[in-house]
């Protein structure tokens, strides 16, 4: 965070240099991503009910597949308000948030609605799970808000739910609100919550909830200070203890080993684990314990980031490994300055520019046993086009760039693309993983869930 302030104070372009600066880089990553011959077969796992009006695409706004840790039961959310439990391969409505949260809204914005969900690792005993959803501005006072002179388009709400019977196929229980945050626009909200799946009882990380908070569109709407001021939470990954009560509102805990808790007189909220993101909408862990976050970029760079406690990942003074001016044209990027090291920014471990795709989605390492060829690979892709990528987890190292490879698909043995399969230019691609480590693909355009079921390697 200090890097952001220093940059804004020091690196303001002079009038004489603005003409040169405004040129920007036209092709920041000239190297192309190549297909290396990996083709993975997909098998349709299930079809979700149409929830969009008049059968318009996307048919079902499905964005996340997760599972209940003890049983492995699969769940999928629909941004329009449904949380499904998969029974015998078919979606059964587990919870309709519209009926439980009367102020719930799923517009405006591509990601507004029931954004994410996560089951507490002790769900089988405590019956607790968590969701994020959107409500109209000023529905209630936000714990994380800003001056009334700045409009709020939506509020994102983090809720804890407690079921009466963890084995039930439909929700019956209670809820309590943990916090809400105002957002300038309907984009880049609180689209990801997750627990560290590697943490065991007694570990520091066990039961701590990670929350990806986007910048809410603040930077592109002219309020870049919301993503740079030290006392703000926009553009960060938070880590909280839902069982604690030492937060300012007394509804959750701030883990004592969070990076900014021990800093005397710090303005930085203790909830912050890492900062400097535009939209950290997918967070995961590799088998060796590395935490990764995909960050959707502005106009040029999509990135995979290796997350470390207290690190700053650059937004809004960096997009990937490139400079941007948050007070100028944020659609331009420039080379790093000679004194870049003084800002202590953690750069992506993998990135592609908009020649390849325009909105990254990730990303999961294959942990299963059914397709040995996929072991040691982290899979991700491009949301709109459905283009598919991977990197080797052995190449993930801070300060270096992992080599991105393209992979392709067949469905039931027939070579195709996701665009062809769902009959839409916009695929709306997302990934999921089950309790056995097998991977899945969700396509919002046609409301389908596919399982990765086989792979072959040919020459690229």
Residue ranges and their predicted role:
Residues 142-197:
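Asp-box/WD-like beta-propeller blade repeats and closely related beta-sheet repeat scaffolds
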Residues 430-460:
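Blade-level signature of beta-propeller repeat domains, shared across WD40, Kelch, NHL, RCC1
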């Amino acid at each position: 965070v200090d890097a952001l302030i220093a940059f804004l104070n020091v690196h303001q372009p002079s009038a004489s240099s603005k003409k040169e600066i405004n040129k920007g880089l036209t092709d920041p990553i000239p190297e192309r991503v190549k297909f290396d011959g990996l083709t993975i077969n997909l098998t349709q796992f299930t079809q979700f009910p149409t929830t969009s009006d008049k059968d318009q695409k996307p048919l079902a706004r499905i964005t996340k597949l997760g599972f209940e840790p003890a049983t492995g039961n699969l769940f999928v959310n629909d941004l329009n308000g449904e949380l499904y439990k998969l029974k015998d391969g078919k979606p059964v409505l587990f919870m309709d948030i519209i009926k439980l949260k009367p102020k719930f809204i799923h517009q405006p914005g591509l990601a507004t609605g029931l954004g994410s969900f996560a089951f507490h690792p002790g769900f089988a005993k405590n019956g607790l799970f968590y969701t994020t959803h959107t409500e109209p501005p000023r529905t209630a006072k936000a714990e994380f808000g800003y001056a009334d002179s700045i409009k709020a388009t939506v509020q994102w709400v983090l809720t804890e739910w407690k079921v009466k019977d963890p084995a039930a196929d439909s929700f019956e229980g209670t809820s309590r609100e943990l916090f809400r945050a105002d957002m300038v626009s309907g984009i880049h909200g609180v689209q990801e919550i997750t627990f560290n799946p590697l943490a065991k009882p007694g570990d520091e990380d066990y039961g701590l909830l990670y929350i990806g908070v986007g910048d809410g569109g603040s930077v592109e709407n002219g309020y870049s200070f919301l993503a740079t001021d030290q006392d703000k939470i926009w553009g960060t990954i938070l880590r909280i203890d839902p069982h604690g009560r030492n937060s300012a509102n007394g509804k959750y805990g701030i883990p004592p080993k969070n990076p900014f808790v021990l800093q005397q007189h710090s303005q930085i909220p203790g909830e912050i684990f890492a900062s400097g993101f535009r939209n950290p909408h997918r967070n995961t862990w590799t088998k060796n314990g590395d935490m990764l976050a995909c960050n959707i970029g502005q106009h040029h760079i999509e990135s995979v980031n290796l997350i470390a406690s207290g690190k700053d990942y650059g937004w809004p003074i960096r997009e990937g490994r490139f400079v941007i001016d948050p007070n100028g044209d944020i659609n331009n990027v420039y080379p790093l300055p000679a004194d870049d090291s003084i800002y202590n920014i953690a750069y992506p471990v993998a990135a592609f520019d908009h020649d390849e795709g325009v909105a990254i989605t990730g990303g999961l390492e294959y942990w299963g046993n059914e397709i040995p060829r996929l072991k040691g690979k982290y899979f991700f892709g491009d949301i709109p086009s459905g283009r598919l990528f991977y990197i080797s987890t052995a190449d993930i190292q801070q300060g270096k760039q992992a080599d991105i490879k393209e992979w392709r698909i067949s469905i039931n043995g027939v070579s195709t693309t996701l665009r062809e399969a769902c009959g839409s230019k916009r695929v709306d691609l997302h990934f999921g993983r089950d309790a056995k480590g097998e991977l899945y693909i969700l396509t919002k355009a046609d409301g389908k869930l596919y399982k990765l079921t086989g792979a072959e390697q040919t020459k690229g």
